[in-house]
C-alpha cells in the first residue's frame, strides 16, 4: 500500500512541477469511461485544484462506443473534471468515410476494404480515423484554453504499440511508468481511500468495465491481443527485461509468442518518426 501511495504522490508531484515550469493554463483529457483516463482524472484533479487551473474533460462518442462506457465516463467526468461535456462525432466520422453522406452510405474508395486486408486490419484502419478525429477535437480545446492534452497510455500499451500514431496520444503521460496491472492497483487503492459514495461509484465503474480500445475493433483488449488477462500480458512483458522470469516463455507458450511479436512489430511506433541523419 505504501508503495502505491508513493507512486501516486510522485506522479502528482512531477505533473505539478511540469505545469508550473511550463506555465500551463489548463489540462485537457479525453474521458473514455475506461480505467486509464479515469485514474488520470482522479490524480489530476488534485493537482489542478492545488494550482487553480481547470481540468477539462470530454467524452467523445463515435458510432461503436457502448452505453456502459458513456455511463462510466459521465460518472468520472462529473465527479473529477472542472468542466465536462459529452460529444458525438459520429456524423463527422461518417462524412469522412462515406460519399455524399447522409444521402449515401457508399464508402469512399480510399476507405473501402482492400483485397489484401484482413477484416481485423480493415477495422484497425477505420478505428485509427476515429482516434484521430477525437484528437483533433481535444487539441483544438488545448489551443483555445492554452493547455496540454493528457495522454492516457500506460506502460503496457506503450510496449504493445496499443495506440494510434497521431491519434490517441498527447503531450503529458502520467501513467507512462505503470503497467496496466499497476493502474488497477492504483484504482483499487483510490477506491479504498475514497469516502464519497458518488466518487466510489465512479471508481468502481472504471475498475469493473471491460477494457477495450474504444474504436469498435474488437469486443475487448484480450480478444485483440489473443491472451486471457493483463496479468498474463504484464508478466510476459516484464520477463523481457528480468532474467529471473526466463521460465515465462514455457509457462505461457502461444500467448508469450503473441505478446513478443506485438512488442517487436510495434517498435517503429516507439521510435516515430524515423529521423534520417546526414
Predicted regions: what they are:
Residues 1-161, 187:
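ATP-dependent adenylation/nucleotidyltransferase module used to activate substrates
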Residues 151-264, 271, 278:
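Mid-to-C-terminal catalytic subdomains of enzymes
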Residues 2-6, 10-13, 17, 258-278:
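N-terminal charge/polar-biased segments
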Amino acid at each position: 500500500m505504501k508503495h502505491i501511495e508513493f507512486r501516486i504522490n510522485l506522479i502528482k508531484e512531477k505533473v505539478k512541477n511540469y505545469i508550473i515550469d511550463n506555465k500551463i493554463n489548463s489540462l485537457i483529457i479525453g474521458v473514455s469511461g475506461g480505467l486509464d483516463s479515469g485514474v488520470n482524472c482522479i490524480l489530476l484533479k488534485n493537482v489542478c485544484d492545488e494550482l487553480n487551473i481547470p481540468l477539462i474533460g470530454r467524452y467523445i462518442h463515435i458510432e461503436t462506443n457502448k452505453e456502459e462506457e458513456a455511463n462510466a465516463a459521465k460518472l468520472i467526468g462529473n465527479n473529477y473534471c472542472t468542466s465536462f461535456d459529452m460529444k458525438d462525432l459520429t456524423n463527422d466520422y461518417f462524412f469522412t468515410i462515406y460519399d455524399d453522406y447522409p444521402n449515401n452510405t457508399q464508402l469512399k474508395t480510399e476507405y473501402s476494404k482492400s483485397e489484401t486486408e484482413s477484416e481485423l486490419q480493415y477495422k484497425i484502419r477505420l478505428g485509427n480515423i476515429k482516434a484521430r478525429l477525437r484528437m483533433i477535437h481535444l487539441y483544438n480545446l488545448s489551443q483555445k484554453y492554452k493547455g496540454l492534452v493528457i495522454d492516457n497510455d500506460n506502460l503496457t500499451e506503450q510496449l504493445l504499440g496499443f495506440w494510434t500514431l497521431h491519434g490517441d496520444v498527447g503531450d503529458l503521460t502520467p501513467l507512462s511508468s505503470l503497467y496496466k496491472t499497476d493502474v488497477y492497483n492504483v484504482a483499487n487503492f483510490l477506491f479504498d481511500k475514497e469516502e464519497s459514495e458518488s466518487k466510489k461509484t465512479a471508481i468502481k465503474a472504471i475498475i469493473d468495465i471491460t477494457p477495450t480500445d474504444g474504436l469498435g475493433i474488437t469486443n475487448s483488449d484480450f480478444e485483440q491481443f489473443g491472451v486471457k488477462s493483463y496479468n498474463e500480458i504484464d508478466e510476459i512483458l516484464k520477463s523481457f527485461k528480468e532474467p529471473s522470469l526466463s521460465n515465462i516463455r514455457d509457462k505461457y507458450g502461444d500467448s508469450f509468442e503473441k505478446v513478443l511479436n506485438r512488442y517487436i512489430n510495434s517498435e517503429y511506433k516507439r521510435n516515430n518518426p524515423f529521423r534520417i541523419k546526414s
